């Protein structure tokens, strides 16, 4: 697990916090064939009670157990047996689980939505943007940038 800190160009404010950077954890899962899956989790003390340090500790504490999982069924069994632990570390688990799902899709050469029984994504995609609770002038400037980029 690697931590990721990316500074914002301007502070981002919402009801729970004001932040000057994003913090995330990245997990890399590798198969015996050398394929790599990546997963990300965003621990937030004010949302999940997690920190980057606690997510890293969760990963260090259980990595050896996950390494014995040879299938998604094994990982699901581990998750079921440790549901309370996962509930206390949801962002850390998200990074692990997403890395495993990404790897599974690559191993099967299928998009993960197909592997999980869905239909392949297609068509035009819509992206969203987030506006924080900054000063009105900053809010307005960012809104104009988003509108110019095609966000509606």
Q: What are these language model-derived features?
A:
Residues 1-37, 42-49:
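Structured beta-strand/loop patches that form or line metal/cofactor-binding pockets in enzymes
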Residues 1-6, 78-79, 90-95, 118-122, ...:
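Generic detector of short, locally flexible boundary/turn motifs and exposed helical patches
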Residues 1-3, 14, 20, 80, ...:
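N-terminal amphipathic alpha-helix/helix-capping segment at the start of soluble metabolic enzymes
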Residues 17-21, 46-48, 56-60, 146-150:
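Short, low-complexity, polar/charged sequence segments that are solvent-exposed and flexible
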Residues 25, 92, 108, 123-129:
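Generic beta-strand structural signal
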Residues 30-107:
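Metal- or metallocofactor-binding catalytic centers and their adjacent structured scaffolds
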Residues 114-152:
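Metal-dependent enolase-superfamily TIM-barrel catalytic cores that perform enediolate-based chemistry
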């Amino acid at each position: 697990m690697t931590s990721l800190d990316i500074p914002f160009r301007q502070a981002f404010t919402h009801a729970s916090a004001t932040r000057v950077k994003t913090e995330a954890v990245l997990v890399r899962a590798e198969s015996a064939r050398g394929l790599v899956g990546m997963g990300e989790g965003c621990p937030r003390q004010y949302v999940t009670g997690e920190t980057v340090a606690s997510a890293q500790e969760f990963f260090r504490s259980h990595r050896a157990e996950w390494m014995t999982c040879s299938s998604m069924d094994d990982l699901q069994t581990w998750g079921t047996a440790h549901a309370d632990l996962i509930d206390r570390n949801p962002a850390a688990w998200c990074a692990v689980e997403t890395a495993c799902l990404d790897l599974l899709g690559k191993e099967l050469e299928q998009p993960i939505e197909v592997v999980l029984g869905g239909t392949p994504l297609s068509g035009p995609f819509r992206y969203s943007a987030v506006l924080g609770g900054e000063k009105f002038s900053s809010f307005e400037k960012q809104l104009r940038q988003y509108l110019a980029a095609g966000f509606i």
